[in-house]
Regions:
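Phosphopantetheine-dependent thiolation modules in NRPS/PKS and related acyl-activating systems
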Residues: 1-76
Length: 76
């Protein structure tokens, strides 16, 4: 997957988990209403979408779709 595809996937997951279709690629998950439980849900969905087990702190360290996609892409 390209980083752009990963970013679009993560953005869609953030929008669905947070129930906010207006989020952009630079939206902070937590500033947009996310909490730790929703973050764990989102991390699991992202992992399923990219076919990897992801660290549970991913969104805490990279809270925007753009930064999160870069981190996931760097994992290979």
């Amino acid at each position: 997957m390209t980083v752009e595809t990963i970013e679009a996937t993560i953005l869609g997951i953030f929008r669905n988990v947070l129930k906010n279709q207006d989020l952009g690629e630079d939206a902070d998950f937590f500033e947009a209403g996310g909490d730790s439980l929703l973050a764990i849900d989102a991390i699991e969905l992202i992992g399923q979408a990219v076919g990897r087990d992801l660290d549970s702190v991913l969104i805490f360290m990279f809270p925007t779709p753009e930064s999160c996609a870069g981190a996931v892409a760097d994992l290979g």
